[in-house]
């Protein structure tokens, strides 16, 4: 066999081998690229799902925060309204007519004053209270003035027992007892 033919045959086999390797490499590269593309798509899909979940969680959290803030604002407004109602009630009690005031003071003294007690009232009610002490023939002394919207404080001589029967205290007690009813009437 001549050398040219052998060289030609080797060259031909080499070219076929190169072609075969190139085809296998191209197939392998295509396979790797397809797998990489599929993996990238899967990673992208998972990242997108995670981002959507995170966005949804943030949205829910923001909605929850807004709802909480709205509820807080509503409660603040309701509290302000209840305080205004309480202040109006105090004002109404402070401004009650003298006849009604006298009846209430008389009732408080009759039912609660014990012999030897000291009675305190607001300056504006001093004359009425002194008059009632005489009228009811109570064995008590008038002790002076206190800062309140009305009513009396009764104290034993030693100062150990003190009955706060001021309108301030009575209004507060009634208001606290009726607060849920007032709230229902105003806000339901």
UniProtKB/Swiss-Prot annotation:
Keyword Cell membrane in record: yes
Location, primary (coarse class): membrane
Family matches, as InterPro entries: ATPase_E_C, ATPase_V1_Esu
Membrane topology note: Peripheral membrane protein
Localization terms from the record: Cell membrane
A Gene Ontology term for the protein's cellular component: proton-transporting two-sector ATPase complex, catalytic domain
GO biological-process terms attached to the record: proton motive force-driven plasma membrane ATP synthesis
Tree of life domain: Archaea
Gene3D superfamilies, per the entry: ATP synthase, E subunit, C-terminal (3.30.2320.30), F1F0 ATP synthase subunit B, membrane domain (1.20.5.620)
Keyword annotations: ATP synthesis, Cell membrane, Hydrogen ion transport, Ion transport, Membrane, Transport
Subunit text: Has multiple subunits with at least A(3), B(3), C, D, E, F, H, I and proteolipid K(x).
Role according to the record: Component of the A-type ATP synthase that produces ATP from ADP in the presence of a proton gradient across the membrane.
Protein family: Belongs to the V-ATPase E subunit family.
Name of the protein described by the UniProt record: A-type ATP synthase subunit E
Organism: Archaeoglobus fulgidus (strain ATCC 49558 / DSM 4304 / JCM 9628 / NBRC 100126 / VC-16)
Gene: atpE
């Amino acid at each position: 066999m001549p050398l040219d033919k052998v060289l030609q045959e080797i060259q031909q086999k080499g070219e076929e081998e190169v072609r075969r390797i190139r085809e296998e490499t191209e197939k392998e590269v295509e396979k790797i690229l397809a797998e990489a593309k599929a993996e990238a798509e899967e990673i992208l899909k998972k990242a997108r799902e995670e981002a959507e979940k995170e966005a949804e969680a943030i949205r829910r959290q923001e909605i929850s925060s807004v709802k909480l803030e709205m509820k807080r604002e509503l409660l603040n407004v309701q509290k302000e309204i209840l305080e205004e109602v309480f202040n109006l009630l105090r004002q109404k009690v402070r401004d009650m007519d003298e006849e009604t005031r006298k009846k209430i003071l008389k009732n408080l003294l009759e039912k609660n004053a014990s012999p030897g007690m000291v009675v305190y009232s607001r300056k504006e009610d001093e004359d009425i209270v002194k008059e009632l002490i005489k009228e009811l023939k109570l064995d008590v002394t008038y002790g002076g003035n206190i800062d309140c919207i009305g009513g009396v404080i009764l104290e034993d001589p030693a100062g150990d027992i003190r009955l706060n029967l001021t309108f301030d205290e009575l209004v507060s007690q009634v208001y606290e007892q009726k607060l849920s009813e007032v709230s229902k009437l105003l806000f339901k």
